[in-house]
A protein has these predicted regions:
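Soluble non-cytosolic domains of exported or imported proteins
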Residues: 123, 304, 337, 341-349, ...
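The catalytic-center signature of Zn2+-dependent metalloproteases
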Residues: 360, 370-393, 397, 550-606
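Conserved catalytic/binding loops enriched for acidic/polar residues
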Residues: 488-503, 509-519, 525-526, 530-531, ...
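Bacterial N-terminal signal peptides
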Residues: 28-41
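Signal peptide processing junction and immediate N-terminal pro/mature segment
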Residues: 41-53
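N-terminal secretory signal peptides that target proteins for export/translocation
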Residues: 1-21
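Auxiliary tRNA-acceptor-end handling modules of aminoacyl-tRNA synthetases
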Residues: 50-339, 357, 361, 366, ...
Length: 958
């Protein structure tokens, strides 16, 4: 070892014998290293976690004393302790040290609304899990990332935590620290009524909903109600909103001044339920439940990285070993005290209908119904109460909606509230005036007259088919842009649809899968109208009252199903054959449908038949089966996988016809005609034919109807138009058979010999084409008495909320018919359907496939019947027929010129059909009588010339 050398200027004396002191040097170095490690492991985190000792005293001097801050404030003790000073409008929240980093739930509800644009009282607007975390002199409001998880003790936990970020929404200043309890005090106004912080995100969605930006005004915002309970805290804040630019504000008829309005928002804070005996239940795609899903990084065995739990209530038997037992804690629904007295019983019956299904799962009286007292002190938005609320709106957004709130870690349902729109009854009680508003609202959405209208249900039945047209070449249409109403030109219609479906409200309701769409309201109105037209029932008759109660009962049972965790099942309406639908001996023992979770239309018997129940009075066999899967008590400990054998045994019945399941995503591409909304029976094609005839009968009855009262002609107009919409729906249901396939969510062991996909029988596809020819494309498909059309006068009131119809003033019958025909033709010959027809030839035996040549040739013969199937009569092509033929011509030309992305075989066939048509046109022109009308001659000659130019032109490429 080298000697230690010191300079002469060093004040330290040299060590004469370094080896002698080597052990001392080693001891000093070891002690220093030990103290450094001890400081890092123990004292440093403690120092960083908050001020202590002198630093703490200094900070306490910087902050106001705790008692001074809460002086004169009312103390509310509960899960969190609150201090409310009504004089200063301050509310403080006290956070205990053990509550930091603990997980809590926040449920946010719109307690008051605007009555339009989806801003409705009772709407859920936010549910999330959060933590409160202290960092220096602030408290962070943190949304942890629970989408990625590991098992307890897994060393991968740190890696997962570093890989995926959490969301720190806000950092709130600490106002004071209690000197003994070491609790932190924050101003709750910094979180809930701040101009800068918008916890529920209302401010961000207002531009989408209202078409203008609004800011939160702190001077107009305040706390309304503040309550603390041992397990939850309930707070209601009133937000004052003002427009950011008064010149850009859209007119809101439900608000006195569109530049400013208030919204009351209710917050429910509660602890995340832990160790309460609840066992999550694994999901199965054959049974329809809402899901709670996460990715498990600790599971290296399963093929599927996701763990999926169904959302369900925590039901336990009082007597665990008994085959039938009441639950320890039943599911209780409270009917809000503002529900009209005459409808409370129908709502009660709708809720209790589910007890039949729970009985098959081993529970008696699993669901109970109570009436909210008129003098109740609790708020319907309180997380401790499940309520059924009566929602009033200026413009109806839905008939009903049934959201539920869950524990996002386990899927346990903790709270549910159902909203029923009061307009569902006014449609009958006020002589269909609400249908007038629906039609105006629909027209506004199509014409773009109200940019703020983003109702996702506004397109009703059209939304399912508009997406089919999105990839089509609509710019090459017939150029007959219709100027009003639902007969707007197709390119504009599709553009509006694309804008609407991107709105925040649309995404909310689509993702929640809970909106019983506005089309349900139209179905209800059609049923009431059919009673008036087919059975001469008056709005005050007992028959109509029974009908209203049947509808409310069915609407309620559907929404309660959502709150139990069930998703839609659009296969649910196919259980009975059309001939059995009105056999009450059958429907009142088995049910009218297999599942009340379908969007079921009114059951209208064909003319001359006995009318049965309009809506199902029972939950169906699928509903019983789904509740059994979700709620049957199964042994196996607390590990969810212990239930798998029993659950798979239940789900293996999926191959049974009555248990077929099709949620929203199975209806997206219009593959399966049985997976459909507002269809009925196991033979929808025949049922649609019945309803088309019912529609024609109602039109005939309108011709003979004598209008009465001040609104007589307007009522006649609305009824006529509503029947038109009903007719349209039946036609569109028919199109689903062409190129269709049935799809079943089955596994190989569920149904021997049955495959997931089965092409629709060739005979049914041909019958569908024949039905479209008869009711849409035939020259005599639409025929109305001129006297009836001249009675269809609109209401002429002009004031807020009731703008007078300006254009077109007379009923646009030509636009209505033209729009229907063009729409059906575009959907029938869409690129997606043509591609499916091409592929169907590979999926069927040659003799069982509906081939592209047959479809294109059949449609062309139907549309150009006067040319290709001439008679001895003088040729006269009506204006409707000419418009339809121009649309068909435009579609074929688009294919030939590669303006649409159709299969190459379809393009070649379109070229061939144009040549055939040109030959027919030339022959017809030669044989035209000299006295033929000029319209027909000009139409035929122009069409022939257009075809020649296309066939002779150089093919253009995209």
């Amino acid at each position: 070892m080298k000697k230690l050398i010191f300079t002469e200027t060093s004040k330290n004396p040299p060590i004469k014998n370094p080896k002698k002191h080597l052990h001392l040097v080693f001891f000093i170095l070891s002690l220093a290293f030990f103290l450094f490690i001890l400081y890092q492991g123990l004292f440093l985190p403690y120092a960083l976690s908050g001020p202590h000792g002198k630093e703490q005293g200094a900070e306490h001097q910087a902050l106001q004393p705790f008692d001074l801050v809460v002086k004169d404030a009312q103390k509310l003790e509960g899960m969190f302790t609150l201090y409310r000073n009504k004089a200063t409008e301050k509310v403080y929240l006290e956070i205990k040290p053990q509550q930091l980093t603990k997980k809590f739930l926040c449920f946010v509800t719109l307690a008051s609304g605007l009555g339009e644009a989806g801003i409705l009282s009772g709407m859920p607007i936010g549910d999330f899990l959060f933590q409160l975390r202290r960092v220096q002199n602030t408290v962070q409001f943190v949304i942890p990332n629970i989408n990625f998880r590991t098992s307890p003790g897994d060393p991968q936990a740190g890696s997962v935590e570093r890989a995926f970020s959490e969301s720190i929404l806000y950092s709130l200043p600490v106002k004071s620290i209690h000197p003994q309890r070491q609790t932190l005090l924050i101003d709750l106004g910094d979180l809930l009524i701040s101009e800068q912080r918008d916890l529920p995100g209302v401010k961000s969605i207002l531009p989408m909903l209202l078409g203008a930006s609004y800011s939160i005004d702190a001077d107009k915002s305040y706390f309304k109600d503040v309550k603390a309970f041992p397990l939850n805290v309930e707070i209601a804040s009133v937000y004052g909103f003002s427009s950011e630019n008064d010149s850009s504000v859209n007119y809101l008829p439900s608000v006195p001044d569109s530049r400013a309005f208030n919204l009351r928002i209710h917050y429910s804070f509660s602890e995340v339920p832990l160790n309460n005996g609840y066992r999550p239940r694994l999901a199965d795609e054959r049974v329809g439940y809402f899901l709670t899903a996460y990715k498990d990084f600790s599971d290296n065995i399963s093929r599927e990285p996701f763990v999926r739990y169904i959302n369900r209530w925590h039901l336990q038997k009082q007597i665990p070993t008994a085959p039938m037992s009441p639950p320890v804690q039943p599911i209780v629904f409270w009917i809000e005290n503002n529900v009209p007295l005459e409808y409370r019983n129908a709502i009660r019956e709708g809720v209790l209908m589910w007890n039949k299904a729970f009985a098959k799962a081993g529970f008696t009286e699993a669901i109970q119904v109570k009436q909210m007292p008129d003098n109740a002190k609790w708020d319907p938005a309180d997380v401790r109460y499940n309520t059924i609320r009566w929602s009033s709106s200026f413009e109806p957004e839905f008939a009903g909606i049934g959201p539920s709130r869950t524990n996002p870690l386990t899927g346990e349902i903790l709270d549910a509230d159902i909203l029923l729109d009061a307009n569902i009854v006014r449609q009958v009680k006020q002589n269909y005036r609400s249908l007038v508003e629906q039609n105006r609202s629909l027209a506004r959405s199509f014409q773009g007259q109200n940019g703020s209208n983003t109702n996702p249900c506004q397109f009703g039945m059209y939304s399912r088919y508009l997406k089919v047209l999105e990839n089509g070449d609509l710019k090459t249409g017939s150029s007959e842009a219709s100027p009003g109403g639902i007969a707007d030109d197709l390119p504009t219609l599709v553009e509006r649809y694309q804008q609407q479906k991107r709105s925040s409200l649309s995404q909310l309701l689509a993702s929640s899968d809970m909106c019983f769409g506005l089309e349900a309201s139209r179905q209800f109105a059609i049923g009431a109208m059919s009673l008036s037209l087919l059975e001469n029932a008056t709005p005050s008759s007992q028959n109509l009252e029974d009908y209203v109660n049947q509808y409310i009962r069915f609407l309620t049972v559907h929404e309660v199903g959502h709150t139990l965790g069930l998703r839609h099942n659009f296969h649910g309406s196919t259980m009975l054959q059309p001939e059995d639908l009105n056999n009450t001996q059958l429907t009142r023992t088995q049910g009218l449908v297999a599942s009340v979770m379908d969007y079921v239309p009114i059951n209208l018997a064909p003319a001359g038949s006995v009318q049965g129940d309009y809506f199902s009075a029972l939950v169906g066999p699928y509903d019983d089966w789904a509740i059994e899967y979700g709620y049957k008590v199964i042994g196996g400990g607390l590990n969810p996988r212990g239930e798998l054998p029993a659950l798979q045994q239940i789900a293996s019945r999926a191959g049974e016809a009555q248990l077929a399941y099709a949620p929203d995503e199975d209806t997206v591409d219009d593959l399966d005609p049985a997976a459909n909304a507002f269809d009925l029976s196991g033979n929808m094609l025949r049922y649609s034919q019945w309803q088309l005839e019912n529609s024609k009968t109602m039109w005939k009855r309108l011709e003979k109807r004598t209008p009465f009262g001040e609104d007589g002609y307007n009522e006649l107009r609305v009824m006529f138009d509503s029947v038109f919409g009903y007719y349209f729906q039946q036609v569109m249901n028919t199109t689903l058979y062409v190129g269709g396939q049935s799809f079943s969510r089955i596994r190989p062991v569920d149904a021997k010999g049955k495959l997931p996909f089965v092409p629709i029988e060739l005979a049914q596809q041909r019958e569908a084409l024949a039905t479209l020819e008869k009711y849409v494309f035939a020259p005599d498909a639409f025929s109305f008495a001129p006297e009836l059309l001249n009675k269809l006068a609109p209401s002429r009131w002009e004031h807020w909320g009731s703008p007078a119809l300006v254009f077109p003033l007379d009923y646009p019958i030509g636009d209505r018919i033209t729009f229907l025909q063009r729409f059906v033709l575009r959907v029938l010959l869409s690129p997606a359907r043509l591609a499916r027809l091409r592929d169907a030839e590979l999926k069927s035996a040659p003799e069982n496939a509906l081939k592209l040549p047959e479809v294109l040739n059949t449609v062309q013969k139907d549309v150009w019947k006067e040319v290709l199937q001439p008679t001895n009569k003088k040729m006269e092509i009506s204006t409707f027929r000419r418009s339809l033929q121009r649309e068909h011509l435009a579609i074929l030309i688009g294919m030939v010129l590669r303006k649409t992305n159709v299969p190459e075989d379809a393009r070649s066939l379109a070229w061939y059909e144009l040549r055939q048509l040109r030959e027919g046109l030339s022959k017809s022109i030669r044989n035209l009588d000299r006295r033929a009308d000029t319209y027909t001659r000009a139409h035929l000659e122009e069409t022939r010339d257009r075809i020649s130019k296309v066939l002779n032109s150089q093919i253009q490429s995209n």
